[in-house]
């Protein structure tokens, strides 16, 4: 198995997903409540070790016009921090991923406002799935 971790970086939580490059499927995992940078990095390093991977995909929240604002800068800084613990980081444009995650929860009969951790990890799954889909050999965007 060639595991990859997907992360949706947020102020209160980090959404988590794990996927497999061979099957090209991503699955949401429980979100991490943010504590402090050192603790967050430790927990992500533990997850990466448990999954046997050093590859992490981080959502990059671009503005609708494609530009990068403060949230994108924070995601890039987070990615740089992940790099300091030996993880290889890729970024994926995550415009509308949180909205889509909320829509998916509603379709599943869940209330997004009561399932914020689920929503964060559902967004991480969408981010990671986008990355996996782009790596398909028959995809011209890959």
Provide a role label for each language-model segment.
Residues 2-7, 11-142:
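Phosphate- and other anionic-substrate recognition elements at nucleic-acid/protein interfaces
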């Amino acid at each position: 198995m060639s595991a990859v971790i997907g992360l949706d970086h947020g102020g209160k939580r980090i959404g988590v997903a794990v996927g497999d490059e061979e099957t090209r499927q991503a699955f949401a995992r429980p979100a991490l409540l943010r504590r402090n940078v050192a603790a967050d990095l430790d927990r992500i390093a533990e997850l990466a070790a448990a999954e046997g991977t050093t590859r992490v995909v981080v959502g990059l929240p671009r503005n609708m016009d494609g530009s990068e604002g403060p949230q994108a800068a924070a995601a890039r800084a987070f990615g740089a921090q992940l790099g300091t613990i030996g993880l290889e980081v890729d970024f994926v444009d995550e415009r509308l991923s949180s909205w889509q995650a909320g829509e998916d929860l509603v379709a599943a009969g869940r209330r997004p406002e009561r399932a914020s951790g689920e929503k964060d990890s559902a967004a991480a799954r969408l981010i990671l799935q986008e990355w996996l889909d782009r790596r398909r050999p028959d995809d011209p965007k890959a």
